[in-house]
Amino acid sequence: MAFPYQCLVARSESSADGAAWTLFGASGSKIVVQSSNGVASVWSRQAVQVLDPKDDDTQEPPGKRIKLSTPKEQKFNFSSLVLSNNGHYLVGVTGEDKCVRVFQIDAQSGLQQLSERCMSRRPSAITLTSDDSTILCADKFGDVYALPLLPSPEDEQVEAPAPALPLEEKDFTPSATVFTVHSGRNRRTLEEQLKQKAKGPAKPKEAITFRHDLLLGHVSMLTDLAFAKIGNKSYIITADRDEHIRISRGVPQAHIIEGFCFGHEEFVSRLCVTRSGLLVSGGGDAHLLVWDWRNFLLNEKLPLRDTVIKHLRSRPDLSSSFKDDASFKTAVSGIWEVPGIKETSEVLVACEGLPGLFNFNVGTGAVNGDSLSLMGNPLDVAFVQTSPNSWTTIVSIDNVHKAGSTSELRENADGARLQYFSKQVDGAWREDAEMGALVSSFALGGTDGPDLTTADDKAVRDILYHVENLRKRPGAED
């Protein structure tokens, strides 16, 4: 079974001769590429050889043969892919090593890695400024950094701070005991302190030696960010786990807060700035919120939960397992604006673990949404231009887990990894079999990866599903 595409992006270029496009998909630790002319390629990180410490020749008697361990391949799975606005560069984040990787896209749509910069904390979201000069990188500790897309030699040789003098380590003894703590929160804190004592003193972190400018910070985990430019003014919009949406000025004044968009009652996981200038946000709430973000005003509340329930009721394969009660909640995993629509702004929304896409017209006062039925849970969405006036939506499908589940595995190992939809003249969405034939090699790309039948189920799930984990549990602060 091939690993699904956890990330999808596409670039399109329209001309008098037609439309050309290139599709990029991250499947585990690989990036698969296919262009409209049929050229395809796969980028993968080379295996790393590791010298077994127990076979170090400095520890062995002279004359004993040195033995190298079998080469081990370290898997660094992509969590984000972003295309530059000019279509010449691809930026990806690999979570396990916390690295931001920049690729140049050549004339044959192949990828050449230009840089690999590992952050001190795992990035949670990235985007690019409109001039493609700067990568904005948000992390799980609430900070946003600016990295040059194409660093100069000086940027790569930033002087590391001098290491602090080692302090004498004192034996740590918690002031509390299991007999003196009474709340669940304090008990968990004590348990963590005892675990840390057993591990010993923490090792000092390696200093980052490339340019990374701290722009702003939240007191909560950052979940998404967006960049917007209006006239000669630029803005950085950030969202966090504590229901906040913050509007900050762009570089170099990102420390100045313009204001906040308050209205969410649960975590905010996704932001989408439409071409019409509206901000659409979603997360753990029952509604999508539409903002006049420059004035920090809430314009609309779109009924996401009700639209999802209506969709689930209409599907015989899901209605039996669905219980329409107050405990049903949604977690937004993606919001994408549909290109090519001039009159209004339409967005497609994915909810974690639900096999459908939910579309809404924003800024029109419409109160109802619609849905597209999928064969499995959606992971990402990309749009390719097939002619000067038409676009096709490509949806990455989880072919590992059953539709509607984030834990139960499929019995059929041959599930589709992609689905394709085109918008018709009447405004309805229809499956696009023609696009499926064009990207047939892409749909099979990266199938020489790890055997998922022997993979750790939790490891696979953690790569694909993590939004619902943002929800705060009752009693967590007790």
Swiss-Prot record:
Subcellular location: Nucleus
Superkingdom of the source species: Eukaryota
Key word Nucleus present: yes
Disulfide bond annotation, renumbered to this chain: none
WD repeats: 14-53, 73-113, 217-258, 263-301
Signal sequence extent: none
UniProt keyword list: Nucleus, Repeat, tRNA processing, WD repeat
SUPFAM superfamilies xref list: WD40 repeat-like
InterPro entries membership: Trm82, WD40/YVTN_repeat-like_dom_sf, WD40_repeat_dom_sf, WD40_rpt
Predominant subcellular localization, coarse grouping: nucleus
Gene Ontology biological-process entries: tRNA (guanine-N7)-methylation; tRNA modification
Biological pathway: tRNA modification; N(7)-methylguanine-tRNA biosynthesis
GO cellular component terms, A-Z: cytosol; nucleus; tRNA methyltransferase complex
UniProt KW Repeat keyword: yes
Quaternary structure (record): Forms a heterodimer with the catalytic subunit TRM8.
HAMAP family referenced in this protein's UniProt entry, alphabetically: TRM82
Family to which the UniProt record says this protein belongs: Belongs to the WD repeat TRM82 family.
Function (record text): Required for the formation of N(7)-methylguanine at position 46 (m7G46) in tRNA. In the complex, it is required to stabilize and induce conformational changes of the catalytic subunit.
Official protein name in the record: tRNA (guanine-N(7)-)-methyltransferase non-catalytic subunit TRM82
Organism whose genome encodes this protein: Phaeosphaeria nodorum (strain SN15 / ATCC MYA-4574 / FGSC 10173)
Lineage of the species this protein comes from: Eukaryota, Fungi, Dikarya, Ascomycota, Pezizomycotina
Gene: TRM82
